[in-house]
């Protein structure tokens, strides 16, 4: 296979096979593709729209070149969004992961520094005193003992660094936004995946189905890559190799509506302060409800289907400081 041929195909608006995509992204990960070539390829993919085969090929390339994580044999999940929704909200997925872990669900959260928003998952966790660069063995220990670990993407997918200058220069969503959530190094088979557009929802669901997940849910929340408390959430639930599409509104979770402005965040320190207050049992109503609906949906991947009951469990927890204890315990792993 030749890099030049693949680039020519892309520039002529032809889709790549899964094998061609895997080859191309392995070349990217190994540093064999120039910034100019990569920028051209990513834009060509974006303008045409990435196919399931192209995304799946990139996922395979990432896994084939990733640092291994000692995956457990017990059930665990991941909650992660593509980012790139441009809304700069507080880190709802990160807070939800901490809450779910406190309720007894094991979560291996995959994430990185922000590339296209103000504050990524690792930015806010660092501000909360968490060492995001612990070894895979230590992270596994945290998951075993504390129900929660954070897997810092650059540590496991070192080759992605070759794409960072291009991503930062382009300042637009690319296949890498789509890729990140799908390449959890623990190979999570249960995931709550947030996407940045309704168009990506279907292609994401189809891609997840090819990756043999046990029970994963893809959501798009009226402009957010999360379950929304300000409007409708489009849902694709992937279970037993079937995809079920439906939509939910805040009332389906038993919560009231809040404006998206009430969820706005900022720099890592600001988001960290808001999350700390929330985990200590003193959170703002909008923050509590946003975390409750997302945690409720994550619980569903473990078979807890009653969303209203799940929300109530979260709200009861967030009247205490137990979730803050989970965060403090996580900080002990260095």
From Swiss-Prot:
Record-linked SUPFAM superfamilies: Nucleoside phosphorylase/phosphoribosyltransferase catalytic domain, Nucleoside phosphorylase/phosphoribosyltransferase N-terminal domain
One Gene Ontology CC term in the entry: cytosol
Catalysed transformations (reactions): N-(5-phospho-beta-D-ribosyl)anthranilate + diphosphate = 5-phospho-alpha-D-ribose 1-diphosphate + anthranilate
Residues that coordinate or bind 5-phospho-alpha-D-ribose 1-diphosphate: 81, 84-85, 89, 91-94, 109-117, 121
Binding-site positions, anthranilate 2: 167
Binding site for anthranilate 1: 81
Cofactor note: Binds 2 magnesium ions per monomer.
Transmembrane segments: none
Any single GO BP term: L-tryptophan biosynthetic process
A Pfam entry, by short name: Glycos_transf_3
Keyword Phosphoprotein: no
UniProt keyword list: Amino-acid biosynthesis, Aromatic amino acid biosynthesis, Glycosyltransferase, Magnesium, Metal-binding, Transferase, Tryptophan biosynthesis
SUBUNIT field: Homodimer.
Name of the protein described by the UniProt record: Anthranilate phosphoribosyltransferase
Lineage start: Bacteria, Pseudomonadati, Pseudomonadota, Gammaproteobacteria, Pasteurellales
């Amino acid at each position: 296979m030749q890099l030049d041929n693949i680039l020519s195909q892309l520039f002529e608006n032809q889709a790549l096979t899964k094998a061609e995509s895997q080859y191309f992204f392995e070349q990217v990960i190994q540093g064999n593709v120039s910034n100019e070539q990569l920028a051209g390829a990513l834009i060509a993919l974006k303008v045409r729209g990435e196919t399931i085969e192209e995304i799946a090929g990139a996922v395979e390339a990432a896994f084939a070149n990733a640092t291994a994580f000692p995956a457990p044999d017990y059930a665990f999940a991941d909650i992660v969004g593509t980012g790139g929704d441009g809304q700069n909200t507080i880190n709802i997925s990160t807070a939800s992961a901490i809450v779910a872990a406190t309720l007894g669900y094991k979560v291996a959260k995959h994430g990185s520094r922000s590339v296209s928003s103000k504050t990524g998952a690792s930015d806010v966790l660092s501000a909360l005193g968490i060492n995001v660069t612990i070894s895979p063995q230590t992270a596994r220990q945290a998951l075993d003992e504390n129900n929660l670990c954070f897997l810092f993407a650059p540590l496991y997918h070192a080759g992605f660094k070759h794409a960072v200058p291009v991503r930062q220069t382009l300042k637009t969503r690319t296949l890498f936004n789509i890729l990140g959530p799908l390449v959890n190094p623990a190979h999570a088979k249960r995931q709550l995946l947030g996407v940045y557009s309704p168009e990506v929802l279907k292609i994401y669901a189809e891609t997840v189905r090819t990756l043999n997940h046990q029970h994963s849910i893809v959501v798009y929340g009226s402009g957010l890559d999360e379950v929304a408390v300000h409007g409708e959430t489009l849902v694709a639930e992937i279970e037993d190799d079937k995809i079920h599409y439906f939509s939910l509104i805040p009332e389906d979770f038993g919560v009231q509506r809040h404006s998206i402005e009430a969820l706005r965040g900022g720099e890592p320190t600001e988001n960290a302060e808001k999350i700390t207050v929330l985990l200590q049992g003193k959170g703002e109503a909008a923050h509590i409800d946003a975390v409750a609906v997302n945690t409720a949906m994550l619980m569903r991947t473990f078979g807890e289907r009653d969303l209203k009951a799940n929300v109530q469990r979260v709200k009861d927890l967030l009247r205490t400081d137990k979730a803050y204890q989970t965060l403090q315990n996580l900080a002990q792993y260095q």
